[in-house]
Amino acid sequence: MISSSLDMLEESLVKKIEVMKKIEEENERQKEILKNYDEVDDKAFEETVDNKGELIDQLLLLDEGFQALFDKVKEELGDNKDSYRDQIKRMQDLIQEITGLSASIEANERRNKKLAEGYFSAARQKMNYSRQTSAAAFNYYKTMNNFKDIPPQFLDKQN
């Protein structure tokens, strides 16, 4: 019973690593999308956000299942840890790999957040510039329409 439970815990950790690697791939894809503010594909960006959301949901499910099973196995394992030393060592190695991936993902997320903030800031500036240009053109149009019936003010009168 304990051995099969430890196998399931190990399998859960392996799946978690696979999901985390997929998140890293999505982060790289997101970085490429956001790299050049003028050529951002909004649809592709949204797709990466959705994909990462699904992957994070998978991670949460794996974590919940792992924790529930771990709590049961922990009690049963008790003093028999030496009997399962190899399995425990493999799981510790997997947990170290997960910790490294987690740190890498966090760093990539911070980088992508800065890129996204830059993109949104540039987009806001473009919108403000367009709004200002449009307002200036409208004001010019209104002003010119108001002055169309006024005769010239400066006439050269020579006697």
What does each of the following model-derived ranges do?
Residues 1-61:
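Long, hydrophobic N-terminal alpha-helical segment
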Residues 54-69, 97-108:
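Amphipathic alpha-helical coiled-coil segments
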